[in-house]
Protein backbone atom coordinates (compact mmCIF):
# COMPACT_ATOMS: atom_id res chain seq x y z
CA UNK A 1 0.00 0.00 0.00
CA UNK A 2 1.18 3.50 -0.85
CA UNK A 3 -0.25 6.31 1.30
CA UNK A 4 -0.29 9.93 0.21
CA UNK A 5 -0.12 12.05 3.36
CA UNK A 6 1.62 15.32 2.58
CA UNK A 7 0.93 17.21 5.79
CA UNK A 8 4.49 18.55 6.08
CA UNK A 9 4.53 19.58 2.44
CA UNK A 10 1.21 21.38 2.85
CA UNK A 11 2.53 23.26 5.89
CA UNK A 12 5.56 24.36 3.91
CA UNK A 13 3.40 25.65 1.07
CA UNK A 14 1.15 27.59 3.46
CA UNK A 15 4.06 29.74 4.64
CA UNK A 16 4.11 31.56 1.32
CA UNK A 17 0.34 32.10 1.08
CA UNK A 18 -1.88 35.00 2.03
CA UNK A 19 -4.65 34.66 4.61
CA UNK A 20 -7.27 34.26 1.88
CA UNK A 21 -5.20 31.67 0.02
CA UNK A 22 -4.67 29.64 3.20
CA UNK A 23 -8.43 29.12 3.46
CA UNK A 24 -8.30 27.32 0.13
CA UNK A 25 -5.60 24.89 1.23
CA UNK A 26 -7.79 22.06 2.66
CA UNK A 27 -9.93 21.72 -0.47
CA UNK A 28 -6.94 22.25 -2.75
CA UNK A 29 -5.04 19.51 -0.91
CA UNK A 30 -7.89 17.02 -1.30
CA UNK A 31 -8.25 17.74 -5.02
CA UNK A 32 -4.48 17.63 -5.54
CA UNK A 33 -4.06 14.34 -3.70
CA UNK A 34 -6.88 12.71 -5.66
CA UNK A 35 -5.56 13.99 -8.99
CA UNK A 36 -2.09 12.73 -8.10
CA UNK A 37 -3.41 9.31 -7.06
CA UNK A 38 -4.97 8.89 -10.51
CA UNK A 39 -1.60 9.67 -12.07
CA UNK A 40 0.07 7.20 -9.70
CA UNK A 41 -2.37 4.47 -10.77
CA UNK A 42 -1.72 5.14 -14.47
CA UNK A 43 2.04 5.18 -13.84
CA UNK A 44 1.91 1.90 -11.92
CA UNK A 45 -0.01 0.21 -14.72
CA UNK A 46 2.60 1.41 -17.21
CA UNK A 47 5.37 0.00 -15.00
CA UNK A 48 3.56 -3.33 -14.78
CA UNK A 49 3.51 -3.54 -18.57
CA UNK A 50 7.22 -2.74 -18.72
CA UNK A 51 8.53 -4.80 -15.81
CA UNK A 52 6.20 -7.80 -15.45
CA UNK A 53 5.98 -10.70 -17.85
CA UNK A 54 2.90 -10.27 -20.09
CA UNK A 55 0.61 -8.98 -17.29
CA UNK A 56 -3.04 -9.90 -17.74
CA UNK A 57 -5.95 -7.48 -17.34
CA UNK A 58 -6.53 -9.11 -13.95
CA UNK A 59 -3.07 -7.93 -12.89
CA UNK A 60 -3.32 -4.49 -14.51
CA UNK A 61 -6.66 -3.86 -12.80
CA UNK A 62 -5.34 -4.82 -9.36
CA UNK A 63 -4.98 -1.24 -8.07
CA UNK A 64 -7.57 0.43 -5.86
CA UNK A 65 -7.62 4.11 -4.88
CA UNK A 66 -9.03 5.43 -1.62
CA UNK A 67 -9.48 9.13 -2.24
CA UNK A 68 -8.78 11.89 0.25
CA UNK A 69 -11.80 13.57 1.86
CA UNK A 70 -12.75 16.01 4.61
CA UNK A 71 -13.28 13.33 7.26
CA UNK A 72 -9.64 13.21 8.37
CA UNK A 73 -7.76 15.95 10.24
CA UNK A 74 -5.21 16.20 7.45
CA UNK A 75 -6.05 15.17 3.86
CA UNK A 76 -4.68 11.78 2.90
CA UNK A 77 -5.35 9.18 0.25
CA UNK A 78 -3.91 5.78 -0.57
CA UNK A 79 -3.52 3.28 -3.35
CA UNK A 80 -3.11 -0.44 -2.79
CA UNK A 81 -3.09 -3.77 -4.60
CA UNK A 82 -6.07 -6.09 -4.12
CA UNK A 83 -5.27 -9.08 -1.92
CA UNK A 84 -5.64 -11.80 -4.58
CA UNK A 85 -3.22 -10.08 -6.95
CA UNK A 86 -0.94 -8.99 -4.12
CA UNK A 87 -0.32 -12.67 -3.30
CA UNK A 88 1.85 -13.01 -6.40
CA UNK A 89 2.79 -9.40 -7.29
CA UNK A 90 4.49 -8.95 -3.89
CA UNK A 91 7.37 -11.19 -5.00
CA UNK A 92 8.06 -8.85 -7.94
CA UNK A 93 8.15 -5.89 -5.52
CA UNK A 94 9.89 -7.27 -2.43
CA UNK A 95 11.46 -10.53 -3.60
CA UNK A 96 11.25 -13.54 -1.27
CA UNK A 97 10.38 -17.22 -1.49
CA UNK A 98 7.05 -18.69 -2.55
CA UNK A 99 6.29 -22.32 -1.78
CA UNK A 100 4.31 -24.67 -3.99
CA UNK A 101 1.16 -26.18 -2.53
CA UNK A 102 1.21 -29.06 -4.98
CA UNK A 103 3.05 -30.17 -8.08
CA UNK A 104 6.03 -27.86 -7.81
CA UNK A 105 7.17 -24.89 -9.89
CA UNK A 106 8.43 -25.69 -13.41
CA UNK A 107 11.88 -24.08 -13.66
CA UNK A 108 13.54 -24.23 -17.09
CA UNK A 109 17.11 -25.52 -17.13
CA UNK A 110 17.43 -25.60 -20.92
CA UNK A 111 18.21 -22.03 -22.05
CA UNK A 112 16.11 -22.49 -25.20
CA UNK A 113 13.02 -22.75 -23.02
CA UNK A 114 13.58 -19.47 -21.16
CA UNK A 115 12.08 -16.10 -21.98
CA UNK A 116 13.83 -12.78 -21.29
CA UNK A 117 12.66 -12.93 -17.67
CA UNK A 118 14.30 -16.33 -17.16
CA UNK A 119 10.93 -18.05 -16.87
CA UNK A 120 9.42 -20.86 -18.90
CA UNK A 121 8.22 -19.55 -22.24
CA UNK A 122 4.48 -19.79 -22.76
CA UNK A 123 3.26 -22.78 -24.70
CA UNK A 124 6.47 -24.73 -24.18
CA UNK A 125 4.83 -27.39 -21.99
CA UNK A 126 3.16 -28.75 -25.13
CA UNK A 127 6.57 -29.73 -26.51
CA UNK A 128 7.40 -32.20 -23.77
CA UNK A 129 5.09 -35.00 -24.84
CA UNK A 130 7.40 -36.35 -27.51
CA UNK A 131 9.28 -39.61 -27.83
CA UNK A 132 12.45 -37.96 -26.53
CA UNK A 133 10.95 -36.05 -23.60
CA UNK A 134 9.76 -37.75 -20.43
CA UNK A 135 8.95 -36.98 -16.81
CA UNK A 136 10.98 -38.74 -14.12
CA UNK A 137 12.38 -38.45 -10.62
CA UNK A 138 16.07 -39.29 -11.04
CA UNK A 139 18.23 -39.27 -7.92
CA UNK A 140 15.74 -36.98 -6.20
CA UNK A 141 15.45 -34.54 -9.09
CA UNK A 142 11.91 -34.31 -10.44
CA UNK A 143 11.58 -32.88 -13.91
CA UNK A 144 11.27 -33.18 -17.64
CA UNK A 145 14.19 -35.04 -19.13
CA UNK A 146 15.23 -35.60 -22.73
CA UNK A 147 16.94 -38.60 -24.27
CA UNK A 148 20.14 -37.60 -26.05
CA UNK A 149 21.63 -40.25 -28.29
CA UNK A 150 21.46 -43.86 -27.18
CA UNK A 151 22.58 -43.72 -23.56
CA UNK A 152 22.45 -40.10 -22.37
CA UNK A 153 19.75 -37.87 -20.96
CA UNK A 154 19.62 -34.19 -20.06
CA UNK A 155 17.40 -32.22 -17.72
CA UNK A 156 15.22 -29.63 -19.45
CA UNK A 157 12.85 -28.56 -16.66
CA UNK A 158 13.11 -29.16 -12.94
CA UNK A 159 10.10 -29.07 -10.61
CA UNK A 160 10.95 -27.15 -7.46
CA UNK A 161 8.97 -27.01 -4.22
CA UNK A 162 9.83 -23.34 -3.90
CA UNK A 163 10.52 -20.38 -6.13
CA UNK A 164 13.18 -17.88 -5.01
CA UNK A 165 12.76 -14.31 -6.23
CA UNK A 166 16.10 -12.55 -5.96
CA UNK A 167 15.27 -9.82 -8.44
CA UNK A 168 12.77 -7.06 -7.66
CA UNK A 169 11.79 -5.74 -11.10
CA UNK A 170 8.67 -3.83 -10.08
CA UNK A 171 9.54 -0.71 -8.06
CA UNK A 172 6.02 -0.06 -6.74
CA UNK A 173 6.97 2.41 -4.01
CA UNK A 174 9.66 4.22 -5.96
CA UNK A 175 7.36 4.69 -8.95
CA UNK A 176 4.57 6.08 -6.78
CA UNK A 177 6.80 8.46 -4.83
CA UNK A 178 8.42 9.85 -7.98
CA UNK A 179 5.02 10.66 -9.46
CA UNK A 180 3.88 12.29 -6.21
CA UNK A 181 7.03 14.42 -6.05
CA UNK A 182 6.62 15.51 -9.67
CA UNK A 183 2.92 16.42 -9.63
CA UNK A 184 1.46 17.19 -6.19
CA UNK A 185 2.92 20.68 -5.67
CA UNK A 186 2.02 21.73 -9.21
CA UNK A 187 -1.60 20.82 -8.66
CA UNK A 188 -1.73 22.55 -5.30
CA UNK A 189 -0.56 25.80 -6.85
CA UNK A 190 -3.07 25.48 -9.70
CA UNK A 191 -6.04 24.98 -7.36
CA UNK A 192 -4.95 27.74 -4.98
CA UNK A 193 -4.51 30.13 -7.93
CA UNK A 194 -8.02 29.30 -9.11
CA UNK A 195 -9.48 30.14 -5.70
CA UNK A 196 -7.47 33.37 -5.53
CA UNK A 197 -8.73 34.40 -8.97
CA UNK A 198 -12.32 33.65 -7.96
CA UNK A 199 -12.04 35.76 -4.80
CA UNK A 200 -10.79 38.88 -6.58
Question: Which positions does each model-derived feature cover?
Answer:
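Short, Lys/Arg-rich flexible segments
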Residues: 1-200
Amino acid sequence: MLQVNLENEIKRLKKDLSRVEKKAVPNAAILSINDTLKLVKAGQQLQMKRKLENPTNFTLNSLKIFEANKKTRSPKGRIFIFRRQEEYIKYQIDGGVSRSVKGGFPVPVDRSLKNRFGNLRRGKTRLFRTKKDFYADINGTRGIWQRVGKDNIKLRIVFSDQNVYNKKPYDFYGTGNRIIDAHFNKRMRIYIAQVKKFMK
